[in-house]
Swiss-Prot record:
Location of the protein in the cell: Nucleus membrane; Nucleus, Nuclear pore complex; Cytoplasm
Protein name, entry field: Nuclear pore membrane glycoprotein 210
Signal peptide: 1-20
Ranges that cross the membrane: 1776-1796
Gene Ontology cellular component annotations, sorted alphabetically: cytoplasm; nuclear membrane; nuclear pore; nuclear pore inner ring; nuclear pore nuclear basket; nuclear pore transmembrane ring
Polar residues bias: start-end ranges: 1819-1829
Xref: Pfam families: Ig_NUP210_16th, Ig_NUP210_1st, Ig_NUP210_2nd, Ig_NUP210_3rd, Ig_NUP210_4th, Ig_NUP210_6th, Ig_NUP210_7th, Ig_NUP210_9th
InterPro entries from the UniProt entry: Ig_NUP210_4th, Ig_NUP210_6th, Ig_NUP210_9th, Invasin/intimin_cell_adhesion, NUP210-like, NUP210_Ig1, NUP210_Ig2, NUP210_Ig3
Expression tissues: Expressed in adult male accessory glands (at protein level).
Perinuclear space compartment residues: 21-1775
Gene (name only): Gp210
This protein's UniProt keywords: Cytoplasm, Glycoprotein, Membrane, mRNA transport, Nuclear pore complex, Nucleus, Protein transport, Signal, Translocation, Transmembrane, Transmembrane helix, Transport
């Protein structure tokens, strides 16, 4: 017992101990950090009052957590305070205040030794919540630290490969919708740091490595943790199981589950892999069967490493089988009976032997046949297994299917579309009414054999004819469906009726039927009044309630309605055919039996509740027209008539009804007014007045209107037709006498009965063109004329008056008849009365404000088209009538088989006697019943027909008849038309009398016209519409079928009677199509619009812009001005000879969009390029704006910068030629890779308005080509080629045989002679070249072309740096092909690809494409253009176009700029090219040019106007760059002296003149040069042979002087003029002796080759002579100057010193013919300066300088010392000068022999040594003699030396950017100073 008690006590104690308070962690491990204190919270599980303490305050500190103001805490924060990096332990005590119980926790501090990551999974799924990863730390013993709160860690996601996308990303807890932010890392996320917990989210499938490291310096040794995490996707393969045939393919779809929905994945991340490639193989997602069998297809992820075996991807089962059976079915109902409008799919399926359906791809196809008129195919699969379509036409058709030897057939039956009416029905439910309701459902379509089904037969039954009968009895039956409504009420019953085809019951239509009890009755609509014997339709609506709203019954014919009438004037009749109004279910059809008023009450009782409604009804007499009885009015303009109506609705005084009367008519034609009168009768009258011509209906309507919704309009109306017409015929009625032979009755005889008052009443009737009598003619003016016997008509000779008789009807006036009343004393024989309707009564019309037509009663002449007033007249003969029987007296009839003319006889009695002047020409027949005269031609000729009226006493009528045929045919039409369009051709027929044939348009076949088209495939001709054609014209329509030219003619007749028109040549052209189709421009840019198609030649093409504020067009260049969109419209106009007007024969339009340039981008073909390679860099606009557009912008600044100039450099394509584009033209540049490295190219663009676009950059990497350095490699020939190219191998030896290596993979093929063909495959191959004892391996690599590069062929250079291309330049470019590394491909290929080009403006640049991938540009015009060069076949070429900016301007170094010259012109060409370039002329017989100097002379002219001579400078023969000048040479047909009158002094005279064409009115010199002085220096003597000079005189004295002068023609280079030179052959004294003091006049004439000449008059005034010609000063003694000449000239001579400070000239004396002057020298005369004496003679117009030559070797003090005789004195005096001259000559000879011994010998100019030359002439001639006589040599027999030295001054005038050519010469002397 004690043991038991002890046991119980121990258990109690144990339980108490177990329930005592405890700390949450009795042992805690915390980490140590240098600059971080780690916190950890200890907590007692019972919230009592505890005091906290620590055993080691140096290791840790304890901070209690107090709640409110209490000093008790059951929680405390332990903080690590030590930084000692070793393991220590401290104890935390928690003492309970009340009990003293102490709790302890051991806190261990230590350093972190390792890390580890804890997570629930190492796999993430796309589109799922991010996963949390938590880091844990451990000490050296593997114990885990309790907390890492507040410690920062480095988390890094590393991808296994750089090419794979990032698999996952960090996600903060704040951004995650699935997580809350943990308190321990809340501060870290705010600071953007990462702690010990993190979220990772998968964004792409793949595997990534997550590395976690500690950034603290004290823990750098801790090894980072690496965790591999895979990101997967929820993916399935569709189809999962499929059977295909061998060779066929099936496409698998990869579907990913995202947000519970499947999405198709179409990126390249996933790929499929087949398990057994012998059964099937894959290409992308398409599997192709290879052999019969079964295998699996697995899904692989490219982002997943090959070693990842985390998860086997989804798979599909693929079976390859052979077809065993073919089936056919009609989906979706699997029934071959259908109706129109149904959509079906005809399924043709193959099945394997095991019954598996075979899925077909595109390899095989099933043939099918179906009549698409029955079943319209909308779509079909490529393999033919599914035909999607719609049933279209009723009928039966067969559907066939076949596959190889398998076939199948089915019969498709299509019926009319199935329809059911009505589709929604609401019916009454009344348990007291057992009468079933019958409701007819109407079905249509199908085969009319329907199956009807009731949704609930207990409620409604339906028979086989669609008639439904309600059978509802007890709504509580279990078979009755009662539905609960929204308002809590119950639907009595609901069921459906369905109709279906009997043969295919899946094709059906459904109607819904609802049964409800009635709630309200209402008469919804009723016409409360009606006419007698007409009906009142009372529409009764009964309403039920559903969902708190009323719903009308569809039908309630089974309900019994009670009708109660107050007066029995209506009776109920059957309502068959009456359609109920809206919301009415029953119609009461009541017939009116009596006139009166009644009240009707309609009621119905339901469940002791009476539902009723009341309405008042009225009956009246029907509305009718009283007058006119025929209910039709015919009036002329301005006349009126009254119309009377009776009965109809009347005003009611018992209901609030308003009677409404209205009329409807055309107010332009009629004016209507209502007549107001007081009458007891129910009469209404209106007056209608015709305002203008036309027909209209006058409708009178009257009804009563009630302001209630149930009111139904019952309108009474009567319509009267009113004709407002022109008068056309006048009829006069009286009693007449007839012939005895007349078969007419005697009552219409012409017997006049005289009354007692001698009055004659003639009834007047005016009819319109339809012979309708006008009811009132008061607005017409009638003129009356009278004649007795044979007298002419006279007006107003007999008293007469015109009256209108009226009648009255119910007080309304109505017209009766119009009469002409005459008063005659007697009636003469043949008394005639003629009435004429000539005009309107303008006064009456003015009263009504009516303006009648002008001319009055005008009709149109069908022949002339003019409007004229017809003759409206008639006459009465009291004893004889002279009526016109025929409308004309002449007519022509066309002779043709079965052709006849029919003439109506409108006048006369109708009984005629016919007589022909000649028989056999025409046959005449007359039908008295129809009164038609029929003329049938028999042969060509002329005959006269006489017609006599058998009743009337009138003269016979005569008709002249000509029977004609077709004499000529003329065709008028346009000669050009667009393909598929039509033009009209007018064929004019002329008869045999050369008159236009009157063509009967209704009998065109009688003319036997036929057309003959030379080529019927080009155009077709058919007969056109024959409206609005002229006399003798037939319209045809010509349709263009295809492009081409052909001839067409029209002909008629056969044999000798055949007549044909002249052939008409017609061109059918293609439609004009503008290009480019749709363009996008920026403001300021331009583009050229061009067109294809149109007629040839197209001389009238007009291109315009719709919105000129957006863009404008000049010529064909469109320039953008404003943002927006506009259209460019091109029209081709041709004159239509038919209409005589210009017509648009073809047009097209394109859209131009003007957008803002927001930015640019740099496009380069490569971003990695090897050193030394060159590639283009081009600016493109955003988005995708071509350089072709940007290159046309004006005033745009583009700057290019390179971050590393040592890595790459930028230059433009013209740099090698000396053209450096400035910023405005750098749209495209070249990039050359220099050294390995990385560089950034930046392009900045500033627009014309100052807008700076964002800079565009591109990063380039330049790498070094991999080469073998050690050991030294043997260099082997290797070829880099493009696919589909041909190369010819050639070695240095003969008899070499080429073949492929035995291990060749077939990439290329080679012939034994070395012709290599590359194929489409890429890769490397090896060719072996073998001889008898050697072999050479030749490697060849076939690579795709990455880009093309256009390079200027460096053949020409410019002298000076240019920033634009000089106009006239011709460049040659080559196009190189490069691979993806920048290597140039071998393209010694014959027609590798061919080039094509695009130009911004095609008119400014001439492009010539060569066969060797080169092209030439001819820049003859200034332009701001861009050319794009590309390959014609760019297959496989990624960057197949290169762009070059062409900025061409007129260069200052280019001369001449004009192009028209005439014979005799000397042209000094100037070129910006270097002096080494050569000049050439295309025809040296016309223009000869020195090939070195560029000086040309025009020798002759071309006979053809406009033919050009080409002058080139450069290297044209080697296809290099060159300049070209196009010269147009014209005949010199005008010669003109500079002066017409002049004076000359006698010894010599030169008359300057100019030779030119008559159009060159502004030409004054024949030397055309930019630098005349320079050109003159280089120009030698010029032979002149195209004009001659003659001297003549009119008086005897002048004729005596002619023999003393020599006259010749010459060219003076110094002044650039041609001259006629006179040279005196005798002495001057002899000339003076003859002339003496007389005035002598001579005439100088210059004559060109064709005799055109000009003359000038010369007055001979002998000049003065000065002696000595120079004064040599040896001392200061005076000198005498003698001047001889005529006395009259000497008296006016002026002699002046050049400087009066140092010497003076004094007059001494004047004798006969001689004047003397003294020269006085002053002592201070400087002898080292130049002085002269100036002699001026005004009469002879001479100015002579006499130089004073001083001796500087002698000092002034020695002037009196003499050394012997004069000779010795002279020698000693000039000894210094002689010695100096000798030394200079010797040195010059030595230099010449040393440096210029290879040069030609300079010709001596002997003109310099002739006597009688003035100083000025000597200087000029000496200057000319020092020049190269190159031009003279050019035209003389002497040979021209090409190495002739130019003068130094000329060389110095040039500047070169490539160095002086002579300085660069190899034989130049090092010490030469010629160019210094």
């Amino acid at each position: 017992m004690d043991s038991i008690l002890c046991m119980i006590l121990l258990i109690l104690v144990r339980n108490h101990a177990s329930e005592a308070a405890r700390l949450n962690h009795p042992r805690v491990l915390l980490p140590i950090f240098e600059d971080k204190a780690i916190n950890f919270t200890l907590e007692v599980d019972e919230p009592n009052c505890y005091k906290w303490s620590s055993s080691r305050q140096d290791l840790i500190s304890v901070m209690p957590i107090y709640k409110g103001f209490s000093e008790c805490a059951y929680q405390a924060v332990v903080t690590v305070r030590t930084h000692d990096r070793r393991r220590n332990t401290a104890i935390v005590f928690a003492e309970e205040v009340q009990t003293g119980e102490t709790l302890r926790s051991d806190v261990i501090v230590d350093v972190i030794a390792s890390l580890n990551v804890r997570t629930a999974t190492r796999q993430l799924y796309l589109e799922e919540a991010p996963a949390m990863f938590e880091l844990h730390a451990f000490d050296e013993q593997g114990n885990e630290f309790f907390t890492l709160e507040g410690i920062e860690f480095d988390w890094e996601i590393l991808e296994p490969g750089s090419k794979r996308p990032t698999a996952m990303r960090y996600l903060t807890f704040t951004d995650s919708p699935y997580h809350t932010v943990p308190p321990t890392i809340e501060k870290f996320e705010a600071d953007g740091k990462k702690g010990h917990m993190i979220l990772l989210e998968g964004i792409n499938t793949g595997t990534a490595k997550v590395t976690i490291a500690m950034p603290q310096a004290e823990y750098k040794h801790v090894r980072p943790v690496e965790v591999y995490i895979s990101v997967l996707a929820n993916i399935i393969i569709e189809p999962s199981e499929v059977t295909i045939m061998a060779g066929d393919s099936v496409s698998f779809r990869i579907l990913q589950l995202k947000m519970d929905r499947l999405h198709v994945i179409d990126n390249n991340q996933y790929y499929l892999e087949v398990e057994d490639s012998s059964i099937a193989y894959l290409r992308g997602n398409s599997a192709t069967g290879a052999a019969l069998g079964r295998t699996q297809v697995f899904l692989r992820d490219r982002n997943m490493a090959d070693s990842d075996e985390v998860q086997k991807g989804p798979s599909a089962l693929l079976t390859v089988a052979y077809p065993n059976r073919l089936s056919i079915s009609l989906l979706p109902h699997l029934n071959w009976v259908t109706v129109q409008g149904e959509h079906h799919a005809i399924a043709l399926d193959l099945f394997a032997a095991d019954g598996q359906k075979i899925t077909m791809g595109t390899k095989y196809s099933i043939n099918s046949e179906v009549d698409e008129s029955f079943f319209a195919i909308v779509d079909r699969t490529r393999n033919g297994s599914r035909l999607f379509g719609q049933a279209k036409k009723e009928g039966i058709t067969q559907v066939y299917g076949s596959y190889k030897d398998l076939s199948v057939q089915a019969e498709l039956q299509i019926f009319e579309e199935l329809q059911l009416a009505p589709t929604k029905v609401v019916l009454p439910y009344d348990p007291n009414s057992l009468k079933p309701l019958k409701l007819q459902f109407h079905a249509s379509g199908g085969d009319n054999n329907y199956a009807w089904f009731s949704g609930n037969p207990q409620v409604i039954q339906i028979d086989t004819q669609g008639q439904a009968t309600t059978e509802i009895r007890d709504v509580k039956s279990a078979y009755v469906n009662q539905e609960v409504l929204k308002d809590g009420g119950k639907l009595t019953a609901h069921t459906t009726v369905k109709v279906a085809l009997s043969k295919n019951q899946k094709i059906s239509r459904v109607a819904h039927i609802y049964f409800l009890p009635p709630e309200r009755l209402q008469i919804t609509r009723s016409n409360f009044e009606t006419a007698l014997k007409d009906f009142v339709h009372v529409h009764v609506g009964v309403y039920a309630r559903i969902n708190n709203s009323e719903v009308p019954y569809t039908s309630c014919d089974n309900l019994h309605f009670q009708l109660d009438f107050s007066q029995p004037i209506l009776q109920l009749e059957g309502n068959e055919g009456a359609e109920a109004a809206h919301e009415a279910c029953h119609v009461l059809r009541l017939r009116a039996t009596a006139v009166g008023t009644t009240s009707l009450r309609v009621s119905y009782m339901y469940m002791d509740k009476v539902l009723y409604d009341i309405i008042d009804l009225y009956v009246f007499e029907p509305l009718v027209v009283l007058n006119p009885i025929e209910n039709e009015v015919v009036l002329p303009v301005g006349s009126s008539r009254n119309i009377i109506y009776a009965n109809g609705p009347q005003r009611s005084f018992t209901v609030a009804a308003e009677i409404i009367q209205s009329t409807a008519f055309d107010e332009k034609i009629l004016k209507v007014s209502k007549l107001e009168f007081d009458t007891q009768n129910l009469i209404t009258a209106f007056t209608v007045l015709c305002r203008e011509l036309g027909e209209t209906q006058f409708t009178y309507r009257v009804h009563n209107s009630l302001p209630t919704s149930s009111f139904a309009l019952y309108q009474s109306e009567v319509t009267t037709k009113v004709h407002c017409v022109r008068p056309r015929f006048l009829k006069l009625y009286a009693r007449h006498n007839l012939r005895d032979s007349c078969p007419l009755e005697k009552r219409t005889s012409l017997l006049f009965l005289k009354d007692p008052e001698n009055k004659i009443e003639i009834e007047i009737e005016v009819h319109d063109s339809n012979n309708r009598r006008l009811m009132n003619i008061s607005s017409l003016g009638l003129d009356w004329e009278f004649s007795a016997g044979e007298e002419r008509y006279q007006k107003n000779i007999i008293p007469h008056r015109q009256i209108s008789e009226l009648e009255f009807n119910h007080g309304v006036t109505l017209p009766s008849r119009d009469l002409l009343v005459l008063t005659l004393s007697e009636v003469a024989t043949n008394f005639r009365i003629k009435g004429t309707v000539s005009q309107y009564n303008d006064k009456l019309l003015a009263q009504h404000g009516i303006h009648a037509e002008r001319p009055p009663f005008g009709i149109k002449n069908p022949q002339t088209g003019l409007i004229y007033t017809p003759l409206i007249e008639n006459e009465i003969r009291l004893h004889a009538v002279n009526s016109t029987l025929l409308p004309k007296d002449y007519m022509s009839i066309f002779l043709a088989s079965g052709y006849s003319e029919r003439i109506p006889i409108a006048q006369g009695s109708g009984y005629l006697q016919l007589e022909l002047s000649e028989a056999g020409i025409v046959q005449v027949e007359y039908n008295e019943n129809t009164r038609i005269l029929v003329l049938t031609p028999l042969r060509l000729g002329h005959v006269r027909l006489e017609l006599t009226d058998r009743c009337l006493m009138n003269e016979p009528s005569h008709l002249s008849i000509s029977v004609v045929g077709i004499g000529a045919i003329e065709v008028v039409s346009m000669d050009r038309l667009e393909r598929t369009t039509r033009i009209e051709a007018i064929v004019r027929l002329f008869d045999t009398n050369d008159n236009l044939l009157l063509v009967d348009q209704s009998k065109l076949s009688a003319y036997d016209l036929s057309e003959v088209v030379a080529d019927q495939s080009i155009l077709s001709v058919r007969l056109g519409e024959q409206e609005n054609v002229g006399p003798g014209e037939i319209r045809y329509t010509i349709t263009g079928n295809q492009v081409g030219e052909t001839k067409i003619l029209f002909q008629s007749g056969k044999g000798i009677y055949k007549v044909a028109s002249d052939p008409l040549n017609i061109q059918v052209f293609a439609p004009i199509r503008l290009f480019p189709r749709d363009s996008t421009l920026v403001v300021g840019s331009s583009i050229q619009v061009y067109f294809h198609g149109g007629p040839h030649p197209n001389t009238n093409m007009i291109i315009s812009v719709e919105k000129e504020q957006v863009a404008t067009i000049s010529s064909t260049v469109v320039t953008a001005h404003k943002l927006g969109t506009t259209k460019i419209v091109g029209k081709c106009l041709l004159k239509n000879p038919v209409t005589g007007k210009d017509e648009v024969v073809s047009q097209d339009s394109v859209e131009v969009h003007v957008v803002a340039l927001k930015g640019v981008q740099i496009r380069t073909p490569l971003v990695r390029i090897h050193s030394g390679a060159v590639m283009p860099a081009t600016l493109w606009g955003l988005s995708d704006l071509s350089p072709m557009i940007l290159g046309t912008l004006q005033n745009t600044k583009i700057s290019w910068k390179v971050s590393q100039p040592q890595v790459v450099e930028i230059f433009n394509v013209f740099t090698t030629a000396g053209i450096e584009y400035q910023s405005g033209d750098l749209i495209s540049v070249r990039v050359r890779a220099l050294n390995p490295g990385k560089a950034t190219i930046t392009a900045s663009v500033t627009l014309a308005d100052g807008t700076i676009l964002p800079p565009a950059t591109v990063d380039l990497q330049v790498f070094k080509t991999l080469e073998l350095v050690t050991p030294n490699a043997i260099k082997m020939d290797s070829i880099l080629a493009a696919p589909r190219s041909i190369l010819q191998l050639k070695s240095n030896m003969d008899n070499v045989v080429y073949k492929l290596d035995d291990r060749s993979n077939g990439i290329v093929s080679v012939t034994p002679d070395g012709l290599v063909h590359t194929k489409d495959s890429l890769g490397r191959d090896l060719i072996i070249a073998t001889t008898a004892d050697q072999s050479l391996p030749i490697g060849i690599e076939v690579k795709n072309v990455q880009y093309i590069l256009v390079t200027l062929m460096p053949i020409l250079k410019l002298r000076e740096l240019e920033h634009k291309i000089p106009r006239g330049m011709n460049f040659v470019f080559k196009v190189s092909l490069h691979d993806n590394l920048g290597n140039e491909l071998s393209h010694n290929i014959e027609d590798f690809n061919g080039l094509r080009y695009e130009l911004g403006n095609k008119d400014d640049v001439d492009v010539q494409i060569d066969n060797n991938l080169t092209f030439a540009l001819n820049l003859m015009r200034e332009t701001n253009n861009v050319i794009g060069i590309s390959l014609k076949d760019s297959t496989g070429v990624k960057h197949s176009m290169d762009f070059i900016k062409l900025s061409v301007v007129e260069s200052d170094n280019l001369f001449p700029t004009k192009t028209i010259f005439s014979v005799g012109d000397i042209i000094c060409f100037d070129s910006p090219l270097t002096l080494s370039s050569t000049w050439r002329s295309s025809n040296e017989q016309i223009v000869y040019i020195n090939k070195h100097t560029g000086i040309a002379q025009v020798l002759s002219h071309r006979l053809k106007p406009g033919e050009k001579i080409e002058i080139t400078n450069g290297d044209e023969t080697k296809r290099g760059g060159f300049l070209k000048y196009d010269l147009e040479v014209r005949e010199s047909d005008t010669i003109l002296f500079v002066k017409s009158v002049d004076t000359f002094s006698g010894p010599e005279y030169r008359g300057q003149l100019v030779i030119r064409n008559h159009l060159q009115s502004e030409k004054y010199s024949n030397l055309i040069a930019q630098n005349v002085s320079k050109c003159a220096r280089e120009l030698g003597s010029v032979p002149v042979n195209f004009f001659t000079c003659r001297l003549a005189a009119k008086d005897a004295l002048g004729r005596n002087l002619l023999k003393m002068y020599k006259v010749d023609a010459l060219f003076e280079p110094s002044i650039g003029q041609y001259s006629c030179r006179l040279q005196l052959l005798t002495g001057f004294i002899e000339l003076l002796s003859i002339v003496k003091t007389h005035d002598v006049y001579l005439e100088l004439e210059a004559v060109v080759a064709k005799g055109v000449s000009d003359k000038m008059s010369l007055k001979l005034v002998p000049g003065i002579k000065v002696f000595p010609e120079s004064v040599r000063v040896t001392d200061l003694k005076p000198h005498e100057i003698h001047i001889s000449g005529l006395d009259k000239a000497l008296l006016k001579v002026q002699v002046k010193p050049s400087d009066s400070k140092y010497f003076a000239v004094d007059f001494i004396e004047h004798g006969h013919g001689l004047s003397k002057y003294r020269l006085e020298l002053f002592d201070d005369l400087p002898l080292d300066e130049n002085f002269y004496i100036l002699v001026v003679s005004p009469d002879t117009k001479q100015s002579i300088e006499v130089p004073i030559i001083g001796n500087t070797m002698l000092a002034p003090k020695c002037t009196d010392r003499r050394y012997g005789g004069p000779l010795v004195y002279r020698i000693l005096e000039n000894l210094g000068f002689v010695l100096t001259t000798t030394v200079i000559v010797i040195i010059s000879i030595w230099v010449y022999m040393s440096c210029f011994q290879t040069q030609g010998v300079t010709q001596v100019n002997f003109e310099a040594f002739k006597k009688g030359k003035s100083r000025t002439e000597l200087m000029q001639q000496s200057g000319r003699s020092s020049q190269d006589d190159t031009f003279g040599d050019s035209f003389n027999v002497r040979n021209f030396s090409p190495d002739r030295r130019r003068p130094p001054s000329n060389a110095l005038s040039e500047s070169y950017i490539y160095g002086h050519p002579r300085l660069n010469s190899s034989n130049r002397s090092e010490n030469s100073t010629s160019f210094s």
